Curated annotation (Swiss-Prot):
Pathway: Sulfur metabolism; hydrogen sulfide biosynthesis; sulfite from sulfate: step 1/3. One of its GO terms (cellular component) is chloroplast stroma. This is ATP sulfurylase 1, chloroplastic. Belongs to the sulfate adenylyltransferase family. The keyword Nucleotidyltransferase applies. Mediates selenate (Se) reduction, and promotes Se and sulfur (S) uptake and assimilation. It comes from Arabidopsis thaliana. It catalyses: sulfate + ATP + H(+) = adenosine 5'-phosphosulfate + diphosphate. It is an enzyme of class 2 (transferase). CDD domains: ATPS. Pfam families: ATP-sulfurylase (PF01747), PUA_2 (PF14306). GO terms for molecular function: ATP binding; sulfate adenylyltransferase (ATP) activity. Homotetramer. Its EC number is 2.7.7.4.
Length: 463
């Protein structure tokens, strides 16, 4: 991964969205139908400079170096709550300000606003988007141990204190309602629900969070885990005047690359001089059949090495959030977090954050609802949403291209399932579907799995 590390060192990161007004209200994406009212709402918010974080400033919750020893001593005398791997990932998210202006695990009022309104109302009356609950569950025994204490210490599975939660509030964990409102179904088999909710405690504890030191995973990828503040600093060094974010949890194929390069071309046509792509793979919990993070990062490296994406205009960084697979509800969180990292444009595709129905043979969400919801979501008015055109393999040109409905017979749609099947069988996709180096990484990954394995490496957690 040395070469991609060099890319990062050469590629400053963008954080506050840089925007410019467009007298013709031209959209910075190719021939996408978009309601004129929504179009005016988005383009009208364009202005110069990196976009400000939600609430006006990043809320970073890491204790300053001189106070860390003292805080660790304090933690030793407080009631203890042990965190799961996913709890630690959410602590990481909170600590760096991805959820700004949230200052800790949610209290009940914040939880209810998130469930019912997908937003939080701030003291000044303004509204910021918040579509997924960031909460910490405890059981009856832990609740009893806490008693009347107003503070608790959070510990990792190794027994080390990692944070202090103060001015706490404990309230009921309405699991069924949480699941129904977040996913739109209570069907069995939802990956995040099975992992983090079903067996969680019946109480939630919220409060003000102090994280005792920066979160590290020691997995060889920490250099890619740039905080919103670090992204902003690097992007400002680059003098980027637009930042367009692309979230993914899958390997990059040439269709993705086409969408990203076409977006940059459109931004240049709008008059921007130095638009920067934030390629931002999700680094938290993912379901069992997704390619693990370390292999995805190897694959992304090859995409840059092979010149599919330009290293000079691409920033690769890891987004630490766990994945819900909650479709239009979750995609709002993905977009909101990128505002805090400085992105003013967000690329959204077909069925973002979606998955197949866990019981029935159909998609869980309408494929178009994600981009439609983003165009209307409360608190996302400052973010320019870029729905992209459908890309498929053009058999006449031997490459990925935008789908032309006038000649559908010329196009081949290669699904994720088909891609995985080809890689597992050590077969090659059509030339032009993915760069050879990137495809080899996928083949190597599937070859590394034992027949008895479940296709997953152990979950990486902070240490």
């Amino acid at each position: 991964m040395a070469s991609m590390a060099a890319v990062l060192s050469k590629t400053p990161f963008l954080s506050q969205p840089l925007t410019k007004s467009s007298p013709n209200s031209d959209l910075p994406f190719a021939a996408v139908s978009f309601p004129s009212k929504s179009l005016r709402r988005r383009v009208g918010s364009i202005r110069a400079g990196l976009i400000a974080p939600d609430g006006g400033k990043l809320v970073e919750l890491i204790v300053e170096e001189p106070k860390r020893r003292e805080k660790k001593h304090e933690a030793a005398d407080l009631p203890r709550v042990e965190l799961t791997a996913i709890d630690l990932q959410w602590m990481h998210v909170l600590s760096e300000g991805w959820a700004s202006p949230l200052g800790g695990f949610m209290r009940e009022s914040e939880f209810l606003q998130t469930l019912h309104f997908n937003s939080l109302r701030l003291d000044d009356g303004s509204v910021v988007n918040m579509s997924v609950p960031i909460v910490l569950a405890i059981d009856d025994e832990q609740k009893a141990r806490i008693g009347e204490s107003t503070r608790v210490a959070l510990f990792n599975s190794d027994g080390n204190p990692v944070a202090i939660l103060s001015d706490i509030e404990i309230y009921k964990h309405p699991k069924e309602e949480r699941i129904a409102r977040t996913w739109g179904t209570t069907a069995p088999g939802l990956p995040y629900v099975d992992e983090a909710i079903t067996n969680a405690g019946n109480w939630l504890i919220g409060g003000d969070l102090e994280v005792l030191e920066p979160v590290k995973y020691n997995d060889g990828l920490d250099r890619f885990r740039l905080s919103p503040a670090e992204l902003r600093k690097e992007l400002e060094k680059r003098n980027a005047d637009a930042v367009f974010a692309f979230q993914l949890r899958n390997p990059v194929h040439n269709g993705h690359a086409l969408l990203m390069t076409d977006t940059r071309r459109r931004l240049l046509e709008m008059g921007y001089k130095n638009p920067i792509l934030l390629l931002h793979p999700l680094g938290g919990f993912t379901k069992a059949d997704d390619v693990p993070l370390d292999w995805r990062m190897k694959q992304h490296e090859k995409v840059l090495e092979d010149g599919v994406l330009d290293p000079e205009t691409t920033v690769v960084s890891i987004f630490p959030s766990p994945m819900h697979y909650a479709g239009p509800t979750e995609v709002q969180w993905h977009a909101k977090a990128r505002i805090n990292a400085g992105a003013n444009f967000y690329i959204v595709g077909r069925d973002p954050a979606g998955m197949g129905h866990p019981v029935e043979k159909r998609d869980l969400y309408d494929a178009d609802h994600g981009k439609k919801v983003l165009s209307m979501a409360p608190g996302l008015e400052r973010l320019n949403i870029l729905p992209f055109r459908v890309a498929a393999y053009d058999k006449t040109q031997g490459k990925m291209a935008f789908f032309d409905p006038s000649r559908p017979q010329d196009f081949l749609f290669i699904s994720g399932t088909k891609m995985r099947t080809l890689a597992k069988n050590n077969e090659n996709p059509p030339d032009g579907f993915m760069c050879p180096g990137g495809w080899k990484v996928l083949v190597d990954y599937y070859e590394s799995l034992t027949p008895a394995g479940n296709g997953r490496l152990p979950e990486v957690v902070p240490v």
